[in-house]
From Swiss-Prot:
It comes from Polaromonas naphthalenivorans (strain CJ2). The keyword Nucleotide-binding does not apply. GO terms for molecular function: electron transfer activity; FMN binding; heme binding; metal ion binding; oxidoreductase activity, acting on diphenols and related substances as donors. It is a multi-pass membrane protein. Its cofactor is FMN; heme b. This is Protein-methionine-sulfoxide reductase heme-binding subunit MsrQ.
Length: 219
């Protein structure tokens, strides 16, 4: 078991690991590009592109949230080195989502987009998630961490929890029009599990600290 864990850690630290995972993260984009070029997006390709890019945004947000639990549970610290790249891919797909909506639904008409944001709550919520995700992407580099300080940087990046909630609400309202919530419940369960683990882990750490302090006090 120990040898297997060491081998996994060694592979994740290999110079080829990041480029390989980068290429894997690009696969959804490559497929969408090919499907659009070869006319395989169905009867409504514009809607398919808007929907698919939104789905992949939410999936990557879930993947980012899963990094810390997986790192702790599997005792694989090297997983943390991929979190920044995964977060940037979440931003990449949300930009594609926004561009698809702005182009295919709104024709890049800024006034129409502004009216739509003001008129439809689920568009407002989705746009708010994009706005909040932007500073996270902009400060995902070492220079930003150094400039902001680690504590302020960590506080800013806790916005990912709010972003996940807004993304779920956006998806829920979008699905409400079709009265189809199956996928919404799946994503909500995943996010709840990942956030619930964080609450439990924080509580467990606090309890261990209290126990350790009590043990020191006895001695």
């Amino acid at each position: 078991m120990a040898a297997w864990m060491a081998g996994r850690q060694k592979w994740l630290l290999h110079p080829a690991a990041k480029p390989l995972i980068f290429m894997v993260c690009l696969l959804p984009f490559a497929w969408l590009f090919y499907a659009a070029w070869s006319d395989q997006l169905g009867a409504n390709p514009a809607e398919a592109l808007v929907r698919a890019t939104g789905d992949w945004t939410l999936r990557f947000v879930c993947i980012v949230l899963a990094v810390t639990p997986l790192r702790v549970i599997t005792r694989t610290p090297a997983l943390a080195r991929f979190r920044r790249m995964l977060g940037l891919f979440a931003y990449f797909y949300v930009v594609l989502h926004l561009l698809s909506y702005s182009w295919f639904d709104m024709g890049f008409d800024v006034a129409d987009i502004a009216r739509d944001i003001a008129k439809r709550p689920f568009i407002l919520v989705g746009f708010s998630a994009f706005v909040l995700l932007t500073p996270l992407a902009a400060t995902s580099f070492n220079a930003a961490i150094k400039a902001m300080g680690a504590k302020r940087w960590q506080l800013l990046h806790k916005l990912v929890y709010l972003i996940a909630g807004l993304g779920l609400l956006h998806f829920f309202w979008m699905r409400a029009g079709k009265n189809n919530f199956n996928e919404v419940f799946v994503y909500a369960a995943i996010v709840a599990l990942l956030l619930g683990w964080r609450v439990w882990n924080h509580w467990a750490k606090a309890r261990r600290r209290v126990s350790n302090n009590a043990a020191v006090g006895v001695h």
